[in-house]
């Protein structure tokens, strides 16, 4: 007999795990809602042309790609930003700005599963479209930070700006391909590869750029880093403008952070401020990434629109938070014996409690009372209402506290007070 297994890189979530995920999801949603972001969702699959628009066909090996019955090439979404850009152009381009959206959904990447990395995973993120003001960048950073504070997660945020190194590349007349190669090596933290690439470029162009690049990468710290780097890059006008932009953003960020210009972000569409947030769990440290991408909407044939956003890796957040117990608030209603009259009374009681917002389970197995109580105990249900013939005729039921074992009679009219 075949025993079917879940696909490689996917997970089944047991009820206890789902309860914990729902608790964290609810707290993060609370923060998004408090900033008046509106929730959306997009199709699970999009055209491959959309998904590969920025990166080109080389992304094919990282996606789940298929053809529909009309021979159109489709792919399961690997993230949401491209889909949201398409959605914005379709539905929101004439909406008053800024457009503030958030989402929580599953994404798919065809890669080797490992700790904190799956083929199906969940992202929760935001996109703020229509404002190029520093305070818009700050709002997104603050929201990302406050979400993690809301769930009591220990973390560290690193903030940088792609324009600083880009200004250095421009000064030394590097091509876009050369600049992107260096960025990708920085993003991979491949220092040997970076040194080799810089040495090759220096030899080909007869320039000395390595020292300046590593000056930028090595300087990390608080806001004072900006003034120090402005001195070192005094002749690099574009870099100075990027540093001033970052300084204007940080004016509105009242949280602890580390300035780090080694943040390159793996996706090529970022254009300005970038940030990453790290937890403490080895192998799953990065829990959030984001930044500004002012050219993305235009790339998808929309009107030029500045944009900034971020995404949480929800699964990595779950790996980084301390384990916790979810308090059970459910109530079990059971008749002393199985009879239509008592079952109807149980249904009435359950209906009253459910309408008041309580989670109620009825005994659906016709168990004897002792076995019904054992079932409730096994499920961790702390309150059991026992419905007996004599008690119900007097307008009463028995309430049993499963933690203490205490049992008392209560009036039906007081049922909502339990």
UniProtKB/Swiss-Prot annotation:
Subcellular location field: Cytoplasm
Keywords for this protein: Aminoacyl-tRNA synthetase, ATP-binding, Cytoplasm, Ligase, Nucleotide-binding, Protein biosynthesis
One GO BP: histidyl-tRNA aminoacylation
Disulfide bond positions: none
InterPro entries, sorted: aa-tRNA-synth_II, aa-tRNA-synth_II/BPL/LPL, Anticodon-bd, Anticodon-bd_dom_sf, His-tRNA-ligase, HisRS-like_core, HisRS/HisZ, HisZ
Listed GO CC annotations: cytoplasm
Transmembrane segments: none
Alphabetized GO MF terms: ATP binding; histidine-tRNA ligase activity
Keyword Protein biosynthesis: yes
Coiled coil ranges: none
Enzyme nomenclature, EC number: 6.1.1.21
Reactions this protein catalyses: tRNA(His) + L-histidine + ATP = L-histidyl-tRNA(His) + AMP + diphosphate + H(+)
Family assignment from sequence similarity: Belongs to the class-II aminoacyl-tRNA synthetase family.
Protein name: Histidine--tRNA ligase
Organism field: Methanococcus maripaludis (strain C7 / ATCC BAA-1331)
């Amino acid at each position: 007999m075949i025993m079917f297994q879940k696909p490689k890189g996917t997970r089944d979530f047991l009820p206890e795990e789902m309860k914990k995920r729902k608790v964290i999801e609810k707290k993060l949603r609370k923060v998004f809602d408090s900033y008046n972001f509106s929730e959306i969702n997009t199709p699970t699959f999009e055209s491959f042309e959309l998904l590969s628009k920025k990166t080109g066909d080389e992304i094919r090996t990282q996606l789940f790609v298929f053809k529909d019955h009309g021979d159109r090439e489709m792919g399961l979404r690997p993230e949401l930003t491209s889909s949201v850009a398409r959605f914005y152009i379709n539905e929101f381009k004439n909406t008053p700005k800024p457009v503030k959206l958030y989402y929580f959904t599953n994404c798919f990447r065809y890669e080797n599963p490992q700790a904190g990395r799956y083929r199906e995973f969940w992202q929760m993120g935001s996109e703020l479209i229509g404002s190029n003001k520093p305070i818009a960048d700050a709002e997104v950073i603050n929201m990302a930070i406050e979400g993690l504070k809301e769930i009591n997660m220990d973390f560290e945020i690193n903030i940088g700006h792609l324009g600083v190194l880009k200004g250095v590349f421009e000064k030394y007349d590097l091509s876009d391909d050369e600049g992107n190669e260096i960025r990708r090596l920085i993003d991979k933290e491949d220092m040997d590869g970076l040194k080799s690439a810089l040495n090759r470029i220096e030899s080909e162009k007869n320039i000395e750029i390595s020292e300046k690049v590593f000056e930028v990468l090595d300087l990390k710290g608080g806001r004072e880093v900006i003034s120090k780097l402005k001195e070192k890059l005094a002749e690099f006008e574009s870099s100075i403008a990027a540093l001033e932009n970052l300084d204007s953003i940080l004016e509105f960020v009242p949280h602890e952070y580390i300035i780090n210009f080694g943040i390159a972000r793996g996706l090529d569409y970022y254009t300005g401020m970038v940030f990453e947030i790290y937890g403490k769990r080895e192998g799953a440290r990065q829990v959030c990434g984001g930044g500004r991408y002012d050219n993305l909407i235009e790339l998808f044939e929309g009107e030029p629109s500045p944009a900034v956003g971020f995404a949480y890796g929800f699964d990595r957040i779950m790996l980084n938070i301390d384990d916790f117990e979810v308090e059970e608030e459910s109530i079990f209603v059971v008749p002393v014996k199985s009879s239509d009259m008592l079952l109807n009374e149980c249904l009435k009681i359950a209906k009253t409690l459910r309408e008041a917002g309580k989670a109620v389970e009825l005994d659906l197995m016709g168990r004897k009372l002792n076995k019904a109580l054992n079932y409730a105990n096994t499920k961790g249900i702390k309150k059991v209402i026992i419905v007996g013939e004599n008690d119900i005729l007097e307008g009463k039921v028995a309430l049993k506290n499963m933690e203490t074992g205490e049992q008392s009679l209560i009036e039906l009219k007081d049922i909502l007070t339990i």
